[in-house]
Amino acid sequence: LSYRDGRYFDFVKEREFQFPLANIYNHDPIYGKTGTNLANQMTDDEFKTYLYMMGTRGTAFWELYYSPEMIDEGQKWDINAEYLEWAKKNYHILKNAKLIGTTPDKGNTYGYSCWDGEEGIISMRNPSASVKTLSFTLDRNIGAAESLKGKTLNRTTILNYKTTDAQTDYQTVKYGDVITVTLQPGEARIDRKSTR
């Protein structure tokens, strides 16, 4: 994840590409033996996190480079099916992805903020070996609609990986709030924000 996500930051922040992240073509996901060192490397939870984090990049083209003998490990076929159904159902939100945080190339926290109207999905990840925070303002700069001003947004969990703090669904935030999240080493979170 970190290498490819680092390229996204390079494209957007350094090279200033001016097109939607959904239009970037990737050879992803890859979970195969040929030309990789991936054999038997991901647990089911790691594989699920890998897929869902990639989904928040906003792309709709999935090549599924899998070695059958590797994808047969654990519940990976079921996880793949669950993920593809989720990505299709939520593509109207995911396709509007924007970067948050800073490049993972240097071990920094980052994620993607995806919105469609008053409904959003926000991913957050700490690729480093130490506890770090990620802060962002919930506003139009990360894709949240200005029509959310004055409204309360509920948070529901889509994915938690290596999360240690007690989280509960329906924590509330408002447009303009600064959200600061402490992320454990290797932790990833994906939340839905909506007025429902």
PLM feature segments, named:
Residues 1-161, 187:
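Active-site-proximal substrate-binding groove within the catalytic cores of carbohydrate-active enzymes
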Residues 167-196:
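C-terminal beta-strand-rich structural cap/linker in extracellular carbohydrate-active enzymes
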